[in-house]
């Protein structure tokens, strides 16, 4: 079969491969070097086909197609990565709301509530996707502003955050209002995941093993502003409250710690270390990573920045298409280098100032609603999310899609979206 496909002309090869699901195409890259080269050489036509036929309209509005000569698999997989994160978070937020807000705690009650749960999950996806775009774009603009010598945000006398306003100017009135209304629900759901139940007293916390309180506000702000919604999803999926809190503390310590600089050597150090065996730095680094539970051979991250994985990539040849794919650019909101972290961390906003003040002011300025009281609160948003109005809640978001208007894009069931080794892994 492989020989028959590879014997076809290039145009026919592209037409055969392009309609395949994106996960299948990515798996074919691993079959052999010939298939990898075939897909790499035809990735522009593959990406154009999927952008036209499988991407939802709201994704293309926030991430427009690049120049036809620049479109590639990285653009396509980056959007599927964002959709995957939005879908995962919508599933987890809906499950939490079903259990803790709507009090559907038994299998029978959950089965009865399933239609409302499905509508809530589907309607949350485009809104959380827009939030992913906001945090990603804000971080990029913030880093660029500070790297070019701009005045830090916390030193500017502003009423509205200028970078937030610049990002929100990309959203139409309906998107801005809907995302603003759902933002408190997303943040409160994530906050609930990282703290013990509010009803649990000190004795009950000790009995159930809730050893730590909720993280500080600056930790939450750093997670969503620096790590993004993908990092929030990682913490959310960690099983066990103490394990989640330990993962948060480990990540926050890794992000905020300063690199240890070795002290300058004195003249006596030559005599002192004379005859001693010099330790191997590479072995020490590998040992420390193994001790910390990180192994480069079993790492499943798309673009891991741990030292062992980076050293493993450097050993590969530089004249081979296998190691010069567009996907080597990494996923959206990949970890920042240390020099950019030093710029952005001291300039973080307080958690209560992120999004809310600027969005509400712009909503009133654009006259999307007449009064601030007309903006729906969380309980009203939840009722709207589960309301049965005869649609799945995605019709309004599909306007302007380049695909067939009758086509429904299912990001939850897309092959490779939920399977291990999928697009975002």
Please identify what each model-predicted range represents:
Residues 43-264, 268, 272-274:
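Charged/polar low-complexity intrinsically disordered regions
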């Amino acid at each position: 079969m492989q020989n028959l496909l590879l014997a076809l002309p290039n145009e026919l090869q592209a037409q055969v491969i392009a309609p395949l699901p994106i996960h299948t195409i990515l798996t074919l890259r691993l079959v052999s070097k010939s298939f990898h080269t075939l897909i790499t050489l035809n990735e522009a036509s593959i990406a154009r086909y999927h952008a036209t036929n499988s991407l939802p309209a709201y994704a293309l509005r926030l991430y427009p197609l690049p120049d036809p000569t620049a479109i590639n698999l990285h653009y396509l997989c980056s959007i599927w990565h964002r959709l995957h994160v939005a879908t995962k978070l919508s599933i987890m937020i809906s499950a939490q709301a079903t259990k803790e807000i709507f009090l559907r705690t038994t299998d029978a009650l959950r089965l009865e509530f399933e239609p409302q749960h499905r509508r809530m999950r589907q309607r949350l996806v485009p809104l959380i996707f827009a939030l992913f775009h906001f945090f990603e774009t804000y971080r990029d603009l913030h880093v660029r502003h500070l790297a070019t010598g701009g005045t830090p945000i916390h030193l500017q006398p502003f009423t509205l955050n200028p970078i937030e306003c610049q990002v929100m100017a990309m959203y139409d009135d309906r998107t801005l209002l809907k995302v603003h209304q759902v933002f408190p629900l997303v943040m409160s759901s994530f906050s609930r995941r990282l703290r013990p139940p509010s009803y649990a007293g000190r004795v009950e916390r000790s009995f159930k093993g809730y050893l730590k309180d909720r993280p500080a506000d600056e930790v939450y702000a750093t997670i969503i502003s620096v790590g993004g919604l993908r990092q929030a999803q990682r913490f959310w999926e960690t099983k066990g409250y103490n394990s989640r809190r330990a993962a948060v503390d480990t990540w926050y310590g890794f992000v905020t710690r300063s690199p240890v600089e070795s002290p300058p050597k004195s003249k006596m150090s030559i005599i002192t270390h004379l005859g001693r065996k010099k330790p191997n730095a590479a072995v020490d680094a590998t040992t420390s990573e193994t001790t910390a539970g990180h192994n480069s051979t079993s790492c499943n991250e798309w673009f891991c920045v741990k030292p062992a994985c980076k050293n493993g990539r450097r050993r590969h040849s530089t004249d081979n298409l296998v190691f010069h794919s567009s996907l080597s650019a990494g996923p959206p909101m990949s970890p920042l280098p240390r020099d950019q972290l030093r710029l952005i961390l001291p300039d973080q906003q307080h958690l209560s100032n992120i999004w809310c003040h600027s969005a509400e002011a712009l909503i009133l300025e654009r006259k999307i609603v007449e009064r601030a009281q007309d903006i729906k609160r969380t309980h009203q948003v939840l009722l709207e999310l589960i309301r049965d109005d005869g649609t799945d809640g995605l019709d309004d978001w599909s306007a302007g899609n380049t695909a067939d208007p009758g086509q429904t894009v299912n990001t939850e069931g897309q092959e490779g979206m939920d399977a291990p080794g999928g697009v975002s892994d």
